[in-house]
UniProtKB/Swiss-Prot annotation:
GO terms for molecular function: ATP binding; ligase activity, forming carbon-nitrogen bonds; magnesium ion binding; ubiquitin-like protein transferase activity. This is Pup--protein ligase. The active site is at D57 (proton acceptor). It is an enzyme of class 6 (ligase). ATP binds at R53, T66, W419. Keywords: ATP-binding, Ligase, Magnesium, Metal-binding, Nucleotide-binding, Ubl conjugation pathway.
C-alpha cells in the first residue's frame, strides 16, 4: 500500500456497580481511573511513552488515541494496546476503591452507546495531501462510509417501539450530518475542522467519526484498510460511479437496519441503489487498482476479506465471516444464546450479553472469552500488543515523541509534549517542533535527549 499515516481515537464507556447496582457516578469512576495518571502526569491529559495520548474526554469518557502508525497490523496492535493500558488503570482503580472500603466492579466498554442513549465515538484519522481537492475526497468517500457498516459494523440490539431489532451499526442512529466542523454537537460523518497536527502547508488530516468501535482485530484491519484503499484511489484520480446520496443520514439508518444489504436507498439523481451495490463498486475499483501495482500482501489481505464479506452477505451465509466481522460474530453469539434459552431479542439478558461483548476486562468480557476459545480470527498476538503498550511505532514521528518521553521520565525532568511539540520545561524552555509525521529520525530530538 502507498505509505500513509493513520491513527484511531477510541472513547470508552464507563460504569461502576456493586451487587448489580450503580455504585458511583461516571465522573467519580473516571476520577478513580485517572488518579494514577494524574499522580505522575499532573493532568488527566497525557502522552505516553508508546507515543499515544490518553485523556478524559467530555462526559467522563476515557479516550485513547493511538500513536501515528504507517502499517495496518501495527495500528491494530496499538489500538489493542489502548485496551490493555485502560484495563491496567481499571485494576488499579478497583484496588483503590477496595482500600477505601467502597468496593465495586468497574466496567470499561469499547462500544458506542450507553443505556441512556448517549453516544461516544471511534474516530479514524488519515493524513492526506494538502494539494488534493478536499471536497472531492469528501464527496466520493461519503457513500462508502455510509454503507461500510456492512463490512465493519459492531452490531447492536436496538429497542424500538415495534420491539427489538438487530442492527449492523451502533453509531448509525447518532449521526446527524454528512460533513461538518463539529464533532459532539452535530455528529457528522466526516469532520472538516482543519487540525493537521503536521505541516499545514503540506498535509491535511481527514477525521472520520462515523465508525463503530471494533473488538475484532480483523474488523479493524478491514475498516481502516478499505478506507485507505478508497482514499488512495481518489488521490490518484480513479473514477467511480456517482452514488451521491439524496439523504445520507436517512440512508445510514436504513442500511443499519437491513442485514441483507439489499434494501435500496435513494440517490441524489433520483435512482436507487443498495448498500451491497455501492460497496461492490468501491471493492471492484480497488481490485483493479491493486492489480496494477507491485505485489502487496496487506492490500491483498484487505481485498480478500472485503470481497468475501460482501459475498457472504449477498448469499446470506454469515458462517463465512462470523469469526472475523464484529456484527456477524455478535449475531452468531446472540442467536445461539436465544436458541439455548428460548428467548426473544427483547429479553434484558440479550441486552446484557450485547454489552458484555464490549467489556475490555480479560476473563470477563465476552469477546475475550470467544478469543480464548479460538472462535475468532486475529491479526496480531498478545506479545505484539504487550510490546505496543510501551514501545512507539519505529517508523513514524511517534518514535521521536516516545523516546523523548521515556528519556525525560528516566532523567526525572519536567517536560511538555503534544502531537507536534517536544519541550523541556527548564530555564531555556527548549522546544523541538516535529512537523513531519513520517520522520522517525531527527538530530534535534537526539540533541535534546542527549542534554538530559
Amino acid at each position: 500500500m502507498q505509505r500513509r499515516i493513520f491513527g484511531i481515537e477510541t472513547e470508552f464507556g464507563v460504569t461502576c456497580t456493586f451487587h448489580g447496582q450503580r455504585r458511583l457516578s461516571p465522573d467519580e469512576v473516571a476520577r478513580y481511573l485517572f488518579r494514577r495518571v494524574v499522580s505522575w502526569g499532573r493532568s488527566s491529559n497525557v502522552f505516553l511513552r508508546n507515543g499515544s495520548r490518553l485523556y478524559l474526554d467530555v462526559g467522563s469518557h476515557p479516550e485513547y488515541a493511538t500513536a501515528e502508525c504507517d502499517d495496518l497490523a501495527q495500528l491494530v496492535s496499538h489500538d489493542k494496546a489502548g485496551e490493555r493500558i485502560l484495563e491496567d488503570l481499571l485494576v488499579d482503580a478497583e484496588r483503590r476503591l477496595a482500600d477505601e472500603g467502597i468496593g465495586g466492579d468497574i466496567f470499561l466498554f469499547k462500544n458506542n452507546t450507553d443505556s441512556a442513549g448517549n453516544s461516544y465515538g471511534c474516530h479514524e484519522n488519515y493524513l492526506v495531501a494538502r494539494a488534493g481537492e478536499f471536497s472531492r475526497i469528501a464527496d466520493v468517500l461519503l457513500p462508502f462510509l455510509v454503507t461500510r457498516q456492512l463490512i465493519c459494523g459492531a452490531g447492536k440490539v436496538l429497542q424500538t417501539p415495534r420491539g427489538a431489532v438487530y442492527c449492523l451499526s451502533q453509531r448509525a442512529e447518532h449521526i446527524w450530518e454528512g460533513v461538518s466542523s463539529a464533532t459532539t454537537r452535530s455528529r457528522p460523518i466526516i469532520n472538516t475542522r482543519d487540525e493537521p497536527h503536521a505541516d499545514a502547508e503540506r498535509y491535511r488530516r481527514l477525521h472520520v467519526i462515523v465508525g463503530d468501535s471494533n473488538m475484532s482485530e480483523v474488523t479493524t484491519l478491514l475498516k481502516v484498510g478499505s478506507a485507505n484503499l478508497v482514499l488512495e484511489m481518489i488521490e490518484q484520480g480513479v473514477q467511480f460511479r456517482d452514488f451521491s446520496l439524496d439523504n445520507p443520514i436517512r440512508a445510514i439508518r436504513e442500511i443499519s437496519h437491513d442485514l441483507t444489504g439489499r434494501r435500496t436507498v435513494k440517490l441524489a439523481g433520483g435512482k436507487e441503489a443498495s448498500a451491497l451495490d455501492i460497496q461492490r463498486e468501491y471493492y471492484e475499483r480497488a481490485v483493479e487498482h491493486v492489480a496494477k501495482r507491485s505485489p502487496d500482501p496487506m492490500a491483498e489481505r484487505v481485498l480478500e476479506l472485503w470481497g468475501r464479506t460482501l459475498d457472504a452477505i449477498a448469499a446470506q451465509d454469515l458462517s463465512k465471516i462470523d469469526r472475523e466481522i464484529d456484527w456477524a460474530i455478535k449475531h452468531r453469539l446472540l442467536e445461539r444464546y436465544q436458541a439455548k434459552h428460548d428467548m426473544d431479542l427483547s429479553n434484558p439478558r440479550i441486552a446484557q450479553l450485547d454489552l458484555a461483548y464490549h467489556d475490555i476486562r480479560r476473563g470477563r468480557g465476552v469477546f475475550d472469552l470467544l478469543q480464548r476459545k479460538g472462535q475468532v480470527e486475529r491479526v496480531t498476538d498478545d506479545g505484539e500488543i504487550e510490546a505496543a503498550k510501551d514501545t512507539p511505532p519505529q517508523t513514524t514521528r511517534a518514535k521521536l515523541r516516545g523516546d523523548f518521553i521515556a528519556a525525560a521520565q528516566a532523567a526525572g525532568r519536567d517536560f511538555t509534549v503534544d502531537w507536534v511539540h517536544l519541550k523541556l520545561n527548564d530555564q531555556a524552555q527548549r522546544t523541538v517542533l516535529c512537523k513531519d509525521p513520517f520522520r522517525a529520525v531527527d538530530e534535534r530530538v537526539e540533541r535534546l535527549i542527549a542534554s538530559l
